[in-house]
A protein has these predicted regions:
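Proline-threonine-serine-rich low-complexity tracts
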Residues: 1-203
Length: 204
């Protein structure tokens, strides 16, 4: 910050005293963040000297700046319950050197993000402890349909003396790229049931 002050001038009982600044910066100079000690020395014609000092403290009250990418929406990678997502990680800037940017939530660029919404938050802290954050979301949608394969059609003669036949088969079980899929029979009869003469359609 630019700081102005009245420059001290020493006096003496005899003429010829000279005042000089021995440390610090002159009035009107740009003082750095922190504390600067200004020292002035007055010396008389006989070599006697006296000094005085004062401090100029400049506080960094300006917050750092950080900008996150736009929210990202992506479909899952084939056969995977998630998706690899890449983005440019934000890096904060500040009026003073020494700002540090870290990720406080979420996953790094190039990671496999799970199905659903992940919030990535980044925080930049400057050398004076001022903090600014930004966040964005990565949404991965599961757009892959589950897979199920039924047995081949079955043809069988009726059991002796019955208008039906006992039929067994391996019930199909679906698979999916994500856990939690459930297979149910929505039409027909379960394996080891007596199927009536005619055509019964089993749907899973």
């Amino acid at each position: 910050a630019v700081v102005t002050y009245t420059t001290p001038v020493g006096t003496d009982n005899c003429p010829g005293a000279v005042t000089v600044q021995t440390t610090g910066l002159p009035s009107g100079a740009t003082f750095p963040v922190g504390t600067t000690t200004n020292t002035f020395k007055v010396t008389d014609a006989m070599g006697n000297s006296t000094t005085c000092s004062f401090t100029v403290t400049v506080n960094d009250t300006q917050f750092p700046v950080i900008s996150c990418p736009a929210n990202i929406v992506k479909s899952n990678d084939a056969g995977v319950c998630g998706a690899i997502v890449t983005f440019t990680a934000p890096v904060g800037t500040d009026n003073c050197p020494g700002a540090v940017t870290i990720r406080t939530t979420g996953l790094a660029s190039g990671s496999t993000f799970p199905i659903g919404v992940t919030t990535n938050t980044y925080q930049v802290t400057d050398a004076s402890g001022n903090v600014t954050t930004c966040s964005f979301t990565i949404t991965v949608n599961d757009t892959e349909f589950p897979v199920i394969t039924c047995p081949a059609n079955i043809v069988k003669s009726n059991d002796v003396g019955l208008c039906s036949a006992l039929v067994t088969y391996t019930a199909p079980v679906g698979t999916d790229n994500c856990p939690g899929s459930v297979t149910v029979q929505t039409a027909g009869l379960p394996s080891s049931s007596y199927f009536s003469v005619g055509v019964t359609t089993n749907t899973f």
